[in-house]
Amino acid sequence: MRTKAGKFRQDSYDENDKFAINKIQKYLLKKNFIIEEKDQEDFDIDIIAYKDGLKYRIEAEVKNTFFTDSGSYPFDTVSFLGRKKKYSNEGLFYYFLLCKKNNSFLYCTSDIIYQEKYKEIKEVNTVHRFGTDVFYRVPRQLCNFRTFNQ
C-alpha cells in the first residue's frame, strides 16, 4: 500500500527503527556514553545520551543507499527528511543515517541540515510513497562518515 509523502509508515518503522536505534546505542556505549532508557515508544527523538556532562539528542534512520565513506557515497548531497525538523524546536540534535547493507553510517547536526538553502520540495512517486514532500539536501562534505568499528 502506498502512503502519502511525509506521512508515517508503520511497515518501514517496524522494519528499521529498532535496528537503527540498537546499532547506534551499542556504538555509543562503546564510546562511553550513558543512554537514557525509554519505558515505551513516544515517537519523539530516538536516543538521548550523555557524555562528559553533555546531553546528546539523536535521531536514527536507515538509508537504502550503499556507502562506506564520503568517497563511496553516490551523490553530492545527503537527503534528510523535512518532517524531522520538528525535533530541532528543542535544540540541536544529531541525525544519523545508517547503511543497513554494511557497517557504515553518517551523521550531521540539525543546525546544518535545516537551513533554507538546503530545502527542497519534491514530488515523490515510488512504490511506497506519493505526493509532495520536503527534503533538505546537504553537501556530503558537511556530513561525518563512519563505520561502527571506529
Task: Cite the ranges covered by each PLM segment.
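Acidic-basic catalytic patches of nuclease active cores, encompassing PD-(D/E)XK
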Residues: 1-39
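Conserved catalytic cores of phosphodiester-cleaving nucleases, focusing on short active-site segments
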Residues: 28, 47-49, 54-66
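Active-site metal-binding core of divalent-cation-utilizing nuclease and nuclease-like domains
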Residues: 34-53
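Short solvent-exposed loop/turn micro-motifs enriched in small/polar/acidic residues
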Residues: 40-42, 87-91
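Non-catalytic C-terminal interaction segments of nucleic acid-processing enzymes
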Residues: 50, 100-150
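Hydrophobic/aromatic beta-strand patches that form the interior of the parallel beta-sheet core
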Residues: 58, 96-97
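Mg2+/Mn2+-dependent nuclease catalytic core
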Residues: 64-87
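Short, surface-exposed beta-edge/turn micro-motifs
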Residues: 90-95, 102-105
